[in-house]
UniProtKB/Swiss-Prot annotation:
This is Nucleoside diphosphate kinase. GO terms for molecular function: ATP binding; metal ion binding; nucleoside diphosphate kinase activity. The lineage of its organism: Bacteria, Pseudomonadati, Campylobacterota, Epsilonproteobacteria, Campylobacterales. Belongs to the NDK family. It is found in: Cytoplasm. Its EC number is 2.7.4.6. It catalyses: a 2'-deoxyribonucleoside 5'-diphosphate + ATP = a 2'-deoxyribonucleoside 5'-triphosphate + ADP; a ribonucleoside 5'-diphosphate + ATP = a ribonucleoside 5'-triphosphate + ADP. Major role in the synthesis of nucleoside triphosphates other than ATP. The ATP gamma phosphate is transferred to the NDP beta phosphate via a ping-pong mechanism, using a phosphorylated active-site intermediate. It is an enzyme of class 2 (transferase). Homotetramer.
Length: 137
């Protein structure tokens, strides 16, 4: 079984659509192996998104991700990385296919409701960032 990391971002948490988003994952055959609601510190967000450190949007991204609570989850299933990315839709909700999470729940390319690992290797690193092995079952 493949695992991937999903983050329900502050805009979606604030809108109260956590359950609706989780339902999308479960309806698509992804199982929640671990989940927790947390408030990221600036340090945590900066470390997690370090790959974007030199990009112009980095500071805005860190500010956004620390603006409210997030829900981090380990999703598990066949082709979990690809399946999650398909469910999320395009990064820009205006370009996301109808029926995807971002098309239905996101407001902008910045406040785009969810994060999902983009590869199996990144999924392993991202999961390890948020979860100890004993937290995943």
């Amino acid at each position: 079984m493949q695992q991937t990391l999903s983050i329900i971002k502050p805009d979606a948490v604030e809108k109260g659509v956590i359950g609706k988003i989780i339902d999308r994952f479960e309806s698509a055959g992804l199982r929640i192996a671990a989940a927790k609601k947390i408030k990221l510190s600036k340090c945590d967000a900066s470390q997690f998104y370090a790959i974007h450190k030199e990009r112009s949007f980095f500071n805005d991204l860190v500010d956004y991700m620390t603006s409210g609570p997030v829900v981090v989850m380990v999703l598990e299933g066949e082709n979990a990385v690809a399946k999650n990315r398909e469910l999320m839709g395009a990064t820009d909700p205006k370009k996301a296919a109808p029926g995807t999470i971002r098309a239905d729940f996101a407001e902008s390319i910045d406040a785009n409701a969810v994060h999902g690992s983009d590869s199996e290797e990144n999924a392993k690193n991202e999961i390890a960032f948020f979860f100890a092995g004993r937290e995943i079952c």
